[in-house]
Amino acid sequence: PVPDSSFLRDP
């Protein structure tokens, strides 16, 4: 499954 890409976004 595709991992959550939320960590790719800047804070």
From Swiss-Prot:
Which GO BP terms apply?
A: neuropeptide signaling pathway
Q: Which GO terms describe its cellular component?
A: extracellular region
Give the main location: secreted
Specify whether Secreted is a keyword of the entry: yes
Q: Where in the cell is it found?
A: Secreted
Could you tell me the keywords of this UniProt record? Neuropeptide, Secreted
The family assignment reads: Belongs to the FARP (FMRF amide related peptide) family.
What job does this protein perform? Answer: FMRFamides and FMRFamide-like peptides are neuropeptides.
> Which protein is depicted?
Extended FMRFamide-10
The scientific name of the source species is Striatophasma naukluftense (Gladiator)
